Swiss-Prot record:
The gene is S6. The record marks 42-43 as: Cleavage. This is Outer capsid protein VP4. Glycans are attached at residues 12, 311-312, 390, 453, 492. It comes from Aquareovirus C (isolate Golden shiner/USA/GSRV/1977). Cleaved during the endosomal proteolytic disassembly of the outer capsid. N-terminally myristoylated. This acylation is essential for the membrane fusion activity.
């Protein structure tokens, strides 16, 4: 059967010469980027005309209003947006005709009015903006256009779903080279595989005529030459070509997007201030309300000011009444780490003790005890507590609903907690005026015996998650600060201090800044590859100067080993991208030396601002080989279709 061609180029899906030849030169595309947000569509100004006189003045101008409502000016941006929307809808005209829905293509001029007048939001604005033969849209026309587009898009959405199902099954895009498959074999394959209710089987020619505008792999044939028709090209071929991956730099669009995002992040987040040696307002460092998790039993008080420790030579027990029963809370034996609530931030505290060992085989007291999170008030700092009399009050803020033995599961002979979370919301106002108050996860012991004399019942080895709800102030080294000197924070902490810092700590705020910088460097600069990059070269320059300075005054100065400097710089840059918080820690080679991060930030910023579309795209030959391997696999798939569904 030959193709039936008319002046509107209607093609038959089974026509002679139809072919399926995907190529990496162009990807499938035709869907327009339609931005119908208010910021794009308004305000554009109303139509004004003089009333009672032919002379336009502020006093004589009035908004034009008739039975169609007021008239808004259709500027170039609005016209382009509407045109793209209609372009997308009208592409489906073959199906609208076949299903007898719609009334022909939608034409924007049918919903607009061309006239002259003045355009503005006020009479004063309009007087300065005369328009001759401008395009306007009335209130009624806007509503009609909106309803028309919405009605058509309802049908298009369903058809698009069915077409997507059919075409993705055929895999019409490849990332390198070209491939081909017998078109009639593909038709037989699709007919067998597609669900019976897929509309592509009901309206094959109509869907085919839509698809050839969207998928470059589909090439309808000329009935005379039995070759692809020279007139048939996808409507989105410009975008398709620029979206396609090239052997040189991959996707130009993707490269451009990476570059643009990196530049915006560098500028918008003030990442160049990361090593400033002057005070910066805390507001420069955007705080994060992301939760952070800790195991308080293993945090030393010297590493985190919000951890305190009871470490009396003998244990202490204090009784309390909870839910009508009497229990004892025990501190010790040995060090017992608690939360200094006056150093804690407003937050939701969740102590997860799931899987924690329950040694009630050696301490039977625990089997009848209740896991709980309590607040302990003392008359002296907890480090100075020596007797139960020093404890003035104990409040249970969260407790399990059963005793420990009913919450346990045996794992390889060891009793452990089932999933159990002790959760409480903490607000600083609730402890105002209480100088010594501490949080502790522990057991409420109903009748302690000598078995507990040698077993510390603390549950602070559980995972404590602190989810901030309000960050009132910023702290550093336990002191409240209203400004941060980044240079003093850099390379000035142990890894334990970094890990145990609360969300309002300057360490965390600067760490968040470092993470953003590391993301920019990692996304836009080929740090992890063997390529010499701007991040590495920025560090090398500082290392070379440092080496020269170290040789000043020596009788036989040693010249720098430049290949070694490049390797050290590459390791430092890679280390920063993979774990940026290392820059906060003491003793990390190269990365924590003064000026290194400043050099890296400056070098990367310069490289990005002067970069090209290819920035951030490296190892192109390796990527090309990988893409070619995918094409080989797809061609093998197409060959199997041709063999299993021979075209007739």
């Amino acid at each position: 059967m030959g193709n039936v061609q008319t002046s509107v180029n209607t093609y038959n899906i089974t026509g002679d010469g139809n072919s399926f030849t995907p190529t990496s030169d162009m990807t499938s595309t035709a869907a327009p980027a339609i931005d119908l947000k208010p910021g794009v569509l308004n305000p554009t100004g109303k139509l004004w005309r003089p009333v009672g006189t032919s002379v336009a003045t502020i006093d004589s101008l009035a908004i034009v209003s008739d039975r169609f409502g007021q008239y808004s000016f259709v500027n170039e941006g609005m016209r382009e947006t509407f045109s793209k929307a209609l372009f997308d809808i009208n592409m489906w005209q073959p199906l609208f005709q076949a299903t007898k829905t719609g009334c022909g293509p939608i034409v924007l001029s049918s919903f607009t009015t061309t006239t002259s007048g003045y355009v503005g939001a006020t009479a004063g604005d309009a007087l300065d903006n005369p328009v001759t033969n401008g395009v306007f849209i009335s209130t009624v026309q806007v509503m009609n256009l909106q309803r028309t587009i919405a009605a058509r898009m309802r049908d298009v959405a369903l058809w698009q779903q069915h077409l997507d199902t059919a075409m993705t099954m055929l895999t019409p895009d490849i990332s390198a080279g070209s491939a081909s498959c017998n078109w009639k074999s593909l038709l037989a394959f699709a007919k067998d595989i597609l669900p019976l209710d897929n509309l592509c089987l009901t309206y094959p020619n109509e869907f085919y005529n839509v698809a050839i505008h969207r998928y470059p792999a589909l090439k309808p044939g000329n009935p005379d030459t039995k070759l692809p028709d020279a007139q048939a090209h996808p409507l989105g071929e410009v975008a398709g070509a620029f979206n396609a991956a090239t052997s040189e730099v991959g996707s130009l669009v993707g490269s451009s997007s990476t570059l643009s995002q990196a530049i915006s992040t560098m500028a918008g987040k003030d990442l160049d201030l990361i090593e400033a040696d002057t005070p910066l307002p805390v507001s420069v460092f955007t705080p994060s309300l992301a939760p952070r998790s800790y195991r308080p039993a293993f945090i030393k008080p010297e590493d985190a000011k919000w951890i305190a420790e009871f470490n009396n030579s003998s244990l202490i027990r204090k009784t309390l009444t909870y839910s009508g029963a009497t229990y004892a809370v025990q501190l010790g034996p040995g060090p017992t780490r608690v939360i200094d609530m006056n150093a804690m931030i407003d937050s939701v505290l969740t102590l997860d003790v799931s899987g924690t060992i329950l040694p009630y085989d050696t301490n039977p007291d625990l089997s009848t005890s209740v896991p709980a999170f309590v607040l302990i008030q003392t008359s002296v700092p907890i480090q100075q507590v020596t007797t139960a009399a020093n404890i003035t009050a104990i409040t249970v803020v969260s407790a399990a609903g059963a005793s420990a033995i009913n919450l346990a599961i045996n794992v390889r002979g060891q009793p452990r907690f089932n999933m159990l979370h002790l959760q409480a919301t903490f607000e600083r106002e609730t402890i105002t005026g209480i100088p010594y108050i501490y949080g502790l996860g522990t057991f409420l012991i109903p009748s302690p015996t000598s078995s507990s004399n040698f077993s510390n019942p603390t549950l602070m080895d559980g995972l404590l998650t602190v989810t901030p709800v309000l960050l009132r102030e910023t702290t550093y080294k336990g002191e409240v600060v209203d400004a941060i000197v980044p240079a003093t924070v850099m390379a000035n902490q142990t890894s334990e201090e970094v890990a145990s810092a609360l969300a309002n700590d300057a360490i965390v705020l600067v760490s968040n800044h470092l993470n953003k910088l590391a993301n920019v460097v990692g996304d836009a600069i080929p740090v992890a590859s063997k390529t010499d990059d701007s991040a590495t070269s920025a560090i090398v320059s500082r290392l070379a100067v440092q080496h020269k300075l170290s040789q000043v005054g020596q009788t036989s100065p040693t010249p720098p080993d430049y290949p070694l400097l490049w390797r050290r710089a590459k390791r430092a840059a890679s280390m920063f991208v993979s774990n940026p918080s290392l820059a906060l820690q003491v003793g990390i080679p190269v990365l924590t030396q003064s000026g290194m991060l400043s050099a890296l930030t400056s070098g990367v910023g310069t490289a990005l601002r002067t970069g090209s579309l290819g920035k951030g795209v490296t190892d192109a030959s390796e990527k090309l080989r990988a893409r070619q391997s995918l094409t080989v696999a797809k061609q093998a798939f197409f060959d199997q279709i041709g063999s299993l569904w021979p075209g007739k």
